[in-house]
Design a protein with these regions (language model features):
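Conserved PRPP/pyrophosphate-binding segment of the phosphoribosyltransferase/PRPP-pathway fold
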Residues: 1-113, 120-155
Length: 155
């Protein structure tokens, strides 16, 4: 994906606005937006978190707040590219947690989790489970694209 792997940050505003439009019903009911976090090492190497960029644009378009501290990636995982569904699930198992300082941003709140691409759903499920364990009342997921089985077409 050009945004994530091609440093095409110029694509983020358009992508974020499309996501805000497509997810307007989810966002209308949400208390806050949570981007899928990167492990600090991956963010340092990439220099940005594409999900956080999209979340900021979506928040601006929808009038919602982004809670960057609500969810942390506590385990450095290998990239998911090329992994099957069960390998992806195993890869992110235990990778996400609501930190003590993020509890207030989560407890009792309706959250919308933001990511760029949904492939197997393993990352979204891992994040949603962590947020629900952390006290969120509900978690919806909003992504820019979904990979369909058998397809490797560029997005």
């Amino acid at each position: 994906m050009p945004l994530k792997y091609g440093d095409r940050l110029d694509l983020a505003p358009t992508m974020g606005r499309w996501m805000a439009n497509a997810g307007r019903e989810l966002l209308a009911d949400a208390d806050a937006i949570v981007p899928v976090p990167l492990h600090w090492r991956r963010q340092w190497m990439r220099r940005f978190n594409q999900s956080a960029l999209l979340a900021e644009i979506i928040a601006k378009a929808s009038g919602r707040v982004v809670t960057h501290g609500a969810l942390k990636r506590v385990k450095a995982t290998p990239q998911q590219v090329g992994l099957g569904k069960s390998e992806r699930a195993e890869n992110v198992q235990g990778a996400f947690r609501v930190p003590a300082e993020g509890k207030a941003e989560v407890t009792g709140r309706k959250l919308v989790l933001i990511d760029d691409v949904l492939t197997s759903g393993a990352t979204a499920e891992g994040c949603a489970r962590a947020l629900l364990r952390g006290g969120a009342s509900s978690v919806d997921v909003l992504v820019f694209a979904r990979v369909v089985a058998g397809g490797r077409a560029p997005i």
